[in-house]
Structure formats: C-alpha cells, structure tokens
C-alpha cells in the first residue's frame, strides 16, 4: 500500500496573489502530488499551503516551494502579524498513511539538508525532527523572529542544523526556514444541547491538557492560586495533547466545545469524543454530535469505527465503508450537515478519478470487459479476483460465526480472522488492477521508438523491466492467495458448520488463484533476458503451487466430512 505524507509550508506572503500563484504552481509540476489547499491571510501576510502524496514526490514539491519562495520573497520588506523569520517560515512533514513518524523524520532531515546545501538557507529542525530538545519548540527556533536573525547567526547557540551560520545578502533576503516532522492536527467541534458558553468552557477546561487555574477554596469565584515563581497553578485536564475552549455559534444556535488534537496517537478522536460526552453528562449537558474542521486521514475514521464496533462486541472484519459509517453515526459527524468521506478524507481526495478501476465495475461489466476483444483484463486479473473471492468467503464465514447465537464469547476470535480476511481480500482486489497495469506497461514499452541504436537499447531495457514487473505481480498474487488458505482452513475447522460449504468454495477459489497466477508467472518469465531472475521465480512459484494443491485437498477433506457428518 502507498505511503502518504502531507506537507504544510507557510510562506511569508499573503497579499500578492501573483507571487502566491507562482509558488503553488511549482507543486502542480510534480507528478503524484495533490495540492489540497491554499489559504492566504492579508493581515498575517502569510499563506498556508497544503499538499499530499508519496514521500519522495512531496519532498521534491517542498523543495520547489522553498526555492521559488526564496527567489520571489524578500524578507527585508516583510511585515505581518504572524511570527516569522523566513520566506518559507515553516515546512513540516506529517505522516498520513502506511508510514511511521521515524520514517518521516528521516525525510524531514534529508529535506532540511538539501535546503541548506543547495539553497544556502539557514535551517532549524523542530518538533520530531529536532536535533536538540530545546529546538523541538517552534517558538524557540523563531526567538526574536527575522529581526534578530542577523545577531543570532554566527553564534554557536544559534548555529543552524543545516545551511550557513552567517548573515549575508542572500540570507538577508531569504531569512531562515524551520523544517519539522509532526503529527496530524485535527480541529473538531463538539455540539452541545445548550446555549451556555460558560457550560461549554467548563467542559473544555475539564478535558483540555492545560486544564483550569486552581482557585482558593476550590470555587469558581476563588482567587487564582500561584506558585512560588508567581505562575498560575493549573489543574490538568483529562486529555493529553489537546487544546480546547467553549463558544457559542450563531449559525447553529448552540454552544460548542472547540478542540485541537495535536497528537491523534496519544488522544484518538473517538477517545476524545467519549471523554467530552462523559464530562458534559456530568454537568447535565449532552453532546449531540460533532463536526470536523478541514481534512482528516482515513485512519481516524477506521480507528473510531473499529473502537465502537468492539464496544458492541461486533466483528471488526467488515468493509472500510461500513467501518466509516459506524464512526460517522457513533460520533454524530452528520449532526449539523451531511458528512461525506469522499470530501473529508485525504486519501479519497488524492485518488486518480480519471483512471477507471476494474474492481469498481459491476459483475456484469467486469465479465463483459473480460470477454471483449481487449487483451486485458486477462488471466492474471481473473486469478487475483478469484483469490479475493476466496478470502471474502472465509471472511463471511468468520463474520457469521462471530454473530452466531450461543457463540457470543467467541466474537473476538472470529473478528480477528475476519479482519485478516479483509486485508487479504483488499490486497487481492488491488492486484486485479495491478495485473492489468503491468500488462499495459509491456504494451507501452513495445510502442517505444526503435529508429536508432539508442532507441532500440532503451526500448529493450524498458521491455525487460516491464516484463519482470509483469512476472512479479502474479507471483505476489500467488503468495497472497496462498496466505488466504490460513483463514479458509480455520473457518472450515472451527467456523459455523452451516457455512462450511462456503469455506470449501473459498479453498477452491484460492487454489485456482494460485494456479492461474502461476501460469502468468511462467508465460511472462519465458521471454526474460535475466534468466537467473526468471528461473528463480518460476521455481519458487512451483513450490507454492504444489503447496496450494495439497492445502486445498486437506481443506476439502475437512469440509466433506462435516457435510457428510462423518
């Protein structure tokens, strides 16, 4: 599955749309990157830019943004209400899906190094990318802002992580840039069945990490208490990594608790929702729902949906669409207005809507497309689809078993099987289209020019690479389909006996998927120049095929014994 990260550079220009457009145009030149938002502010004289994509592509787009901003923005002439010290003031990278924070930190520091070495801009790394504890704080890195940079540069304390440690004409124009790696920030408002801002604030103070000031006598009217240094003594709230206030919204005619969640791994959205509900209820107030401001990673809804399904002791091994529906209904995300994941979830917004997927067709449409004179989809895609159906059947048996009357205490056992089945099914569905894409790569290579010797050499190299890829894809189908035997076998042996025939058909599908994919491995490997690669993948495939045939026979023996009540 693709790794996705987000980048949110803030440039020090919020008034001149000509400059802003030139900077954002650089992002749109990078293939595989989606520009999500451009938010200029005249008062702050600052523009927040948001784009997303695979890490290497995002880093290239970020480099182009910083380079263009350095060319067009002169910090010597900049004035605005927001703290800043560079043409690109901050450039954080944020993990979205299938990537760890540690991996993002590596990308951030490599990007910072490139800014410093190639663009000669002083770079300070902050938050998770910081090289020293005090630099984790962005405010510290910007101490004194641009106006103090000339006196700070050249000192050991303010030596940049990358780039020049000196004040010169170039740095006077560009200023310094802060590069960070941070968690995704979510803005969420909880709708209350009250118009009281005071009640909303009380709930906000109950939950936000900062909490509320400690007062003499423990009364609201008591004098705020201070420590020996004169600082307010705070009673911490219950939710780490959160900030919150209460307010009244004229548009809706209700009060809300408005919250920023700065680390969804520490305080997931669903945990925050339940805690706000609990604190509100303790004050006689009810949370009727909530609204998410801006975009969110799909993980937020998936984690929430699974959390609420688990509370119901229902199987978690259902489709992502169903899981997200549970999340939306559980947290009342559609309380004030419709909530459409296609418009709010980052992963959906960056999907290539121009490319039609085979798996999005109807059964009839897919069969008709296969039967047409077009050579794709062919046996490789069909094999992957058979494997997906095999995994789906095992998942169905697991879900039926999970909810079987009298088996309530076993719901979690079957839920784990169903979850694994959903993962395998989705992997195989991806391979349906990937197999056809691999075939198309071969066709594209065959259509390359061959007029000159250089053309012919490039064409042959491209054809070899495409053919190798077209061999690897069905080989992956073999592996994933074979892995599905684990859940098929488990459901044949321990699942609902009334559905054992479904497990048997699942075994037939998985065996056919492995054998069909192996035929594609062999035919694509036959023409490869790299015989060592070809011979190895064919030999490895033969072992998987033999094991699949054996496993199918074992499962069918179990299935037939149960059907025949032997």
Predicted regions, residues:
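A structural signal for well-ordered alpha-helices, especially hydrophobic packing surfaces
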Residues: 397, 425-432, 439, 471-478, ...
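Conserved small-residue-rich
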Residues: 353-413
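Long, contiguous binding/interaction regions
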Residues: 1-365, 372, 450, 458, ...
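Preference for long, well-ordered alpha-helical segments
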Residues: 111, 121-125, 134-138, 484-487, ...
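Amphipathic alpha-helical interface segments
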Residues: 184-186, 438-508, 512, 524
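A structural-propensity feature for long, helix-poor, extended segments
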Residues: 403-449, 544-553
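Conserved phosphate/anionic-ligand binding catalytic regions in large, soluble enzymes, centered on
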Residues: 9, 80, 85-92, 263, ...
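Non-transmembrane, amphipathic alpha-helical segments
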Residues: 50, 54, 195, 358, ...
């Amino acid at each position: 599955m693709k790794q996705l990260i987000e980048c949110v550079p803030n440039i020090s220009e919020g008034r001149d749309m000509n400059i802003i457009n030139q900077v954002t145009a650089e992002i749109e030149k990078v293939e595989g990157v989606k520009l999500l938002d451009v938010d200029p502010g005249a008062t702050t004289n600052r523009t927040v830019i948001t784009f997303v994509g695979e890490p290497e592509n995002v880093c290239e787009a970020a480099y182009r943004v910083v380079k263009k901003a350095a060319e067009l923005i002169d910090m010597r002439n900049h004035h605005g209400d927001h703290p800043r010290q560079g043409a690109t003031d901050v450039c954080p990278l944020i993990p979205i899906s299938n990537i760890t924070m540690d991996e993002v930190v590596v990308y951030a520091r490599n990007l910072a190094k490139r800014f410093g070495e190639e663009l000669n801009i002083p770079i300070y790394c902050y938050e998770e990318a910081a090289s020293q504890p005090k630099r984790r704080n962005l405010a510290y890195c910007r101490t004194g802002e641009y106006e103090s940079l000339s006196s700070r540069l050249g000192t050991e304390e303010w030596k940049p992580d990358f780039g020049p440690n000196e004040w010169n004409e170039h740095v006077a124009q560009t200023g310094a840039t802060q590069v960070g790696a941070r968690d995704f920030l979510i803005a969420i408002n909880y709708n209350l069945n009250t118009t009281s801002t005071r009640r909303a604030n009380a709930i906000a103070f109950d939950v936000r990490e900062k909490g509320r000031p400690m007062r003499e006598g423990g009364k609201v009217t008591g004098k705020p208490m201070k420590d020996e240094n004169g600082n307010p003594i705070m009673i911490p709230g219950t939710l780490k990594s959160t900030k919150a206030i209460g307010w009244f919204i004229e548009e809706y005619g209700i009060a809300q608790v408005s919250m920023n969640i700065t680390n969804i791994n520490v305080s997931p959205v669903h945990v925050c929702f339940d805690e706000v509900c609990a604190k509100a209820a303790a004050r006689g107030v009810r949370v009727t729902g909530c609204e998410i401001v801006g975009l969110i990673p799909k993980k937020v809804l998936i984690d929430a949906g699974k959390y609420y399904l688990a509370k119901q002791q229902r199987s978690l091994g259902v489709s992502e669409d169903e899981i997200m529906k549970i999340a939306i209904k559980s947290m009342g995300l559609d309380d004030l207005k419709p909530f459409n994941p296609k418009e709010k979830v980052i992963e959906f917004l960056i999907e290539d809507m121009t490319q039609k997927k085979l798996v999005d067709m109807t059964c009839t449409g897919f069969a008709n497309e296969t039967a047409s004179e077009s050579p794709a989809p062919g046996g490789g895609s069909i094999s992957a689809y058979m494997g997906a159906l095999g995994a789906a059947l095992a998942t169905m048996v697991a879900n039926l078993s999970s909810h079987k009357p009298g088996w309530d205490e076993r719901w979690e056992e079957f839920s784990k099987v169903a979850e694994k089945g959903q993962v395998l099914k989705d992997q195989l569905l991806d391979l349906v289209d990937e197999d056809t894409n691999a075939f198309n790569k071969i066709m594209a290579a065959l259509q390359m020019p061959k007029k000159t010797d250089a053309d012919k050499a490039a064409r042959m190299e491209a054809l070899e690479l495409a053919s190798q890829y077209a061999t690897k894809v069905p080989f992956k189908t073999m592996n994933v389909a074979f892995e599905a035997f684990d859940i098929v076998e488990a459901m044949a042996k321990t699942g609902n006996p009334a559905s054992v025939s479904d497990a048997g058909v699942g075994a037939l599908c998985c065996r056919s998927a492995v054998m069909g994919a192996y035929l594609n491995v062999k035919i694509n490997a036959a023409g490869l120049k790299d015989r060592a690669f070809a011979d190895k993948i064919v030999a490895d495939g033969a072992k998987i095929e033999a094991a699949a045939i054996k496993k199918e026979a074992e499962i069918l023996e179990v299935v037939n014994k149960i059907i025949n009540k032997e």
